[in-house]
């Protein structure tokens, strides 16, 4: 079904999350602002929770003002509620993807002159459900039911660990393969939920006037993916089906990121001004360094609506990323600039050991290598290199897509390093990043 959506729309090959942490990333998806600006620095939980500032204006709120009905189903993970307000909350088990889609049908087909915005967010393929102790190597279940059980309407797909594809940032071990088999099974439920949602749109006459954006909040829930700003954490699947585009099955090489989603959907909805930067008059104030200041509310991204049908659009050649926390105790701020040639990571708190999300630390795929010692391989790095990181990591991403050779200390690349540091500083200044002061004070 994911492939069918791509065949009827546009596949973006270079789409990126701006942080690889669930709450923070979803805050960017819905606000169009990097999380260091919207305040959602990390996870929303009942203890010491992060949440966005009260002044942040999010996509569901803006679309409601523009005359849209709004609803969400599944995983939300953002706050406060009034900032991320959806008029309708549809109940469903966020692992039961077909049930989620079915429960959305009443909202989709409701008789109304208003158009609708639906935020369909699964918990799959996040880790969860404990470990499958009955299986070799005791992999995390990734939400899969024990004993080959199935969720309502889902035909569970089972994978042979010996035959799964192992991404290069992971170690090719029995433990990794066992976990990937569970991960891919969980992902197959997402595919089936999407398929059911597509059927419901067609059945109710909404397919030909509904734009669909399909993506993941970040990369795979494995060490080297989630919580990192390596390619495994930031590079995400991204498909857009614009019902009005003539060219179908398009592959687009524009570099886009999650800050571009809100501007694009507001553009499609007609709630965007001619400058393609600031939304219409209801957006009039944005707090500045010394309190509120008058002026247009400017998003950090831009609309890609006009280039969806293109293959190699001009001036879409760089993205920026910003990660600060996962959980409250997992502080490790990183800032990133990545273009076609180079990628620079600034590990602001580099003297600290890299912190682990609890589920990633406990993962058999990580623990197996950790127990072998600091020199044990983990993907293209060692365990030691994964945990202890330098201040700067500079990669020739065009020649070294697996980020295996750090060029930051190379005399040959000294000028490149300074050039990309300057790009990061400008990005931080433009987006009012509080961590910009770390250039001066640390």
Regions found by a protein language model. Give the residues of each.
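Active-site-proximal cap/lid insertion segments
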Residues: 1-4, 13, 20, 78, ...
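N-terminal catalytic scaffold of extracellular/periplasmic and nuclease hydrolases
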Residues: 2-9, 15-25, 30, 34
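Anion (oxyanion) recognition and catalysis
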Residues: 6, 64, 338
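Residue-level detector of anion-binding/catalytic polar loops
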Residues: 11, 69, 343
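Catalytic-site neighborhoods of secreted/periplasmic enzymes
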Residues: 28-118, 123-131, 138, 142, ...
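Short, surface-exposed beta-strand/loop micro-motifs that present aromatic residues
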Residues: 60, 104-108, 332-338, 345, ...
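Polar, glycine-rich mid-to-C-terminal structural blocks
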Residues: 301-306, 316-319
């Amino acid at each position: 079904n994911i492939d069918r959506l791509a065949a009827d729309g546009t596949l973006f090959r270079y789409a990126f999350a701006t942080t690889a942490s669930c709450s923070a990333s979803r805050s960017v998806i819905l606000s169009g602002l990097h999380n260091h600006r919207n305040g959602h620095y990390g996870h929303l939980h009942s203890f010491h929770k992060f949440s966005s500032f009260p002044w942040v204006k999010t996509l569901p709120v803006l679309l409601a003002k523009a005359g849209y009905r709004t609803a969400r189903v599944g995983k939300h993970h953002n706050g406060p509620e009034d900032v991320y307000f959806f008029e309708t909350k549809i109940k469903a088990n966020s692992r039961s993807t077909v049930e989620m889609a079915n429960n959305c049908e009443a909202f989709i087909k409701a008789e109304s002159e208003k158009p609708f915005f639906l935020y369909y967010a699964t918990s799959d393929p996040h880790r969860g459900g404990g470990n499958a102790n009955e299986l070799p190597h005791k992999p995390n279940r990734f939400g899969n039911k024990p004993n080959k059980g199935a969720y309502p309407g889902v035909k569970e797909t089972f994978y042979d660990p010996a035959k799964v594809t192992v991404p290069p940032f992971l170690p090719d071990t029995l433990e990794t393969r066992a976990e990937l088999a569970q991960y891919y099974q969980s992902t197959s439920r997402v595919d089936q939920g999407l398929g059911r949602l597509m059927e419901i749109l067609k059945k109710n006459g909404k397919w030909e006037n509904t734009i669909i954006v399909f993506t993941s909040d970040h990369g795979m829930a494995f060490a080297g993916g989630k919580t990192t700003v390596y390619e495994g954490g930031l590079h995400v699947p991204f498909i857009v089906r614009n019902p009005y585009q003539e060219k179908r099955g398009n592959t687009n090489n524009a570099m886009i990121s999650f800050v571009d989603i809100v501007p694009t959907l507001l553009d499609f909805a007609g709630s965007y001004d001619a400058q393609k930067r600031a939304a219409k008059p209801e957006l009039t104030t944005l707090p500045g360094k010394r309190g509120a200041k008058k002026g247009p509310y400017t998003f950090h991204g831009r609309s890609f609506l006009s280039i969806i049908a293109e293959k190699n659009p001009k001036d879409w050649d760089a993205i920026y990323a910003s990660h600060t926390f996962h959980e409250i105790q997992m502080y490790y701020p990183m800032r990133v600039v990545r273009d076609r040639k180079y990628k620079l990571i600034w590990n602001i708190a580099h003297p600290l050991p890299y912190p682990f999300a609890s589920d990633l630390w406990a993962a058999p795929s990580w623990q197996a290598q950790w127990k072998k010692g600091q020199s044990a391989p983990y993907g293209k790095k060692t365990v030691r290199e994964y945990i202890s990181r330098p201040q700067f990591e500079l990669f020739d991403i065009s020649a070294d897509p697996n980020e295996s050779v750090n060029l930051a200390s190379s005399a040959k690349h000294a000028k490149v390093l300074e050039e990309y540091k300057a790009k990061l500083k400008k990005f931080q200044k433009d987006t009012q990043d509080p961590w910009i002061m770390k250039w001066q004070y640390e």
